[in-house]
Amino acid sequence: MCIRDRSKAPLYVREAYECKKFAFVSDYVRLYALYSEGGIYLDTDVIVKKSFDNYLNNGFFSSIEYHKDMVKSLGIIKNDLNKDYTRKEYVEHIRGIGIQSAIFGGEKGNEFLKCCLDFYKDKVFIMQDGSYYDKVILPDILALCAEKYGFKYIEGQQSLGANVNIYPQEIFTGIKNATDNSVAIHCAHNSWRNKSFLQKTSIFLSQYSWGNKLKKILDIIGVR
């Protein structure tokens, strides 16, 4: 599968490509691949712990991505969500709550995947002031499109329309939230970000128990 002619891709994707912001191109391409061919998408830094067989009957599947510290510190539940955990109309997207985009699968031609692709149709990557439209990323886009099928911004399993199933965070998850129930774990190296040497060092240290004390020092001096 490939998009053979870049000129046929949405303007957002073409502009992101020209700006060499390839992570944002990848967001679209992974959706396009699953919609066109079906299958399971994994980032390159994902560890698969268990079989995906139990999830193959879904039209689309992934997990909730819920950053509870961010949600709490920003007052997201009070300020940005309705009482039924749907997004308030004036809020562009919900910070700290989305759908896991490093691990997901879908059937060829699934209407939810088509909805996600359509999100890009009227978007540009380069704004009028020269800045990039990069604040709304794929976990946000998946969540925004899932709203049409009944998605709510709350932890726990959700069975939605179009045979979309969103599982609890621990099933397809980041390394900090991994449990014995996890099927696949995203190590979240964030290779798409521009990192300083100290930031890269901090990430390296975090992989080893002996590096925890040194990493804490880096955290104190502002390296995240």
Residue ranges and their predicted role:
Residues 4-27, 42-224:
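Glycosyltransferase-associated regions of secretory-pathway enzymes
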Residues 28-39:
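Small-residue hinge/turn detector
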